[in-house]
């Protein structure tokens, strides 16, 4: 419970003064080891507890992990969370072992003292970011993003939207202090936005596509070109150190699933319609903006990109302390042993 409160406090203290001074001495330096003493094939658990977000998870829907792990006598359990920050809270509370989030939630979790490690990243393309938007109702008097100063903007603090808004504001010479942040999970904000009770909303698919089909959204800008390093699979540190063989299987299956999905987009759409109860037209809109570019290993280049994100949160006063991404990594030789060579770029 202590870790969960810390995480919530960090996410709540987004602008201005901080009430988190008590945290600064309590976050342990978890330190990346220079060389591995771990067996890269080790698997100690009989149950893998996976976290996923309510927006949907193809990894869960296709059950590729279950098929791979059943011969090894390992079960897979899935727990749903509203968004990335809530998933990170669940991991800190010991409810899950591994989960998928954007670039921002693990940074807030790190500040709060969570003992986590980065497992694998996500490849980006030139069009990645089309599904994440800053939007207004059609009748809004705001005509362009450059008019955003002073506006109330609704999004989930500590989510990927937090980095999106920082970079978007930076691109037009503004800072986080030039807007009024209102934190609300996307699923809750959608209803209020569709009813015209939210002036500016940051969202993504499928919520964006649902509002788009209803004719109730006008996009001010998307996140294309704002240099996010992309999302990650994150694991509890103790679990990762004791089960690197399981992480190896997870990475292999994820990478293979991305290749399958890009080659079978119609089947992915059918799964989406079935699992998320989406209208076919909404699913078409989601798929038109979605890419399956594959996974990206924890290379020095990716680590540097994630460090840049963490530094921006500190430099803009969103988090109260500077963090080092390298403190939340496994040893380099262990990554090399569990990650396909082709994705270590």
Which residue stretches match the model-derived regions?
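C-terminal segment of N-terminal export signals and the immediately downstream linker at the start
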Residues: 1, 23-46
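Secondary-structure end/capping motifs
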Residues: 243-320
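N-terminal export signals
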Residues: 6-28
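Conserved C-terminal helix/tail region of periplasmic/extracytoplasmic solute-binding proteins
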Residues: 311-345
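Pocket-lining segment of extracytoplasmic ligand-binding domains
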Residues: 104, 187-275
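Solvent-exposed, polar/charged alpha-helical surfaces in well-ordered, non-transmembrane soluble domains
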Residues: 67, 89, 93, 107, ...
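Short, glycine-/small- and polar/acidic-enriched structural segments
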Residues: 37-172, 182-183, 199-202, 227
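Short helix-loop capping/hinge motifs at secondary-structure junctions, enriched
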Residues: 138-146, 175, 238-247
């Amino acid at each position: 419970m202590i870790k969960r409160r810390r995480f919530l406090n960090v996410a709540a203290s987004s602008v201005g003064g901080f009430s988190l001074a008590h945290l600064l001495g309590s976050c342990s330096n978890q330190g990346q080891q220079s060389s591995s003493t771990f067996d890269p094939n080790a698997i100690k658990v009989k149950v893998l507890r996976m976290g996923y977000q309510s927006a949907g998870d193809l990894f869960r829907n296709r059950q590729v992990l279950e098929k791979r792990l059943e011969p090894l006598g390992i079960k897979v359990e899935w727990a749903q969370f509203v968004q990335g920050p809530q998933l990170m809270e669940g991991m800190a509370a010991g409810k899950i072992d591994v989960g998928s989030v954007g670039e921002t939630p693990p940074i807030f979790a790190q500040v709060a003292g969570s003992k986590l490690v980065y497992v694998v990243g996500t490849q980006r393309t030139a069009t990645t970011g089309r599904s994440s938007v800053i939007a207004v109702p059609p009748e809004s008097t705001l005509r362009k993003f450059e008019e955003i100063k002073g506006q109330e903007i609704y999004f989930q603090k500590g989510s990927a939207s937090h980095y999106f808004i920082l970079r978007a504001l930076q691109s037009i010479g503004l800072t986080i202090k030039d807007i009024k942040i209102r934190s609300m999970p996307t699923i809750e904000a959608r209803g209020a936005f569709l009813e015209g009770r939210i002036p500016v909303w940051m969202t993504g698919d499928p919520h964006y596509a649902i509002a788009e089909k209803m004719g109730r959204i006008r996009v001010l800008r998307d996140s294309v070109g704002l240099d996010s390093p992309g999302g990650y699979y994150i694991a509890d540190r103790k679990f990762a150190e004791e089960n690197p063989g399981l992480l190896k299987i997870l990475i292999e299956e994820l990478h293979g699933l991305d290749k399958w999905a890009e080659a079978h987009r119609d089947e992915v759409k059918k799964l989406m319609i079935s699992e998320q109860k989406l209208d076919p037209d909404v699913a078409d809109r989601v798929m038109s903006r979605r890419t399956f570019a594959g996974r990206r290993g924890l290379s020095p280049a990716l680590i540097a990109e994630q460090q840049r994100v963490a530094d921006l949160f500190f430099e803009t006063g969103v988090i109260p302390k500077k963090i080092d991404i390298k403190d939340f990594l496994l040893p380099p030789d262990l990554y090399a042993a569990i990650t396909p060579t082709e994705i270590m770029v």
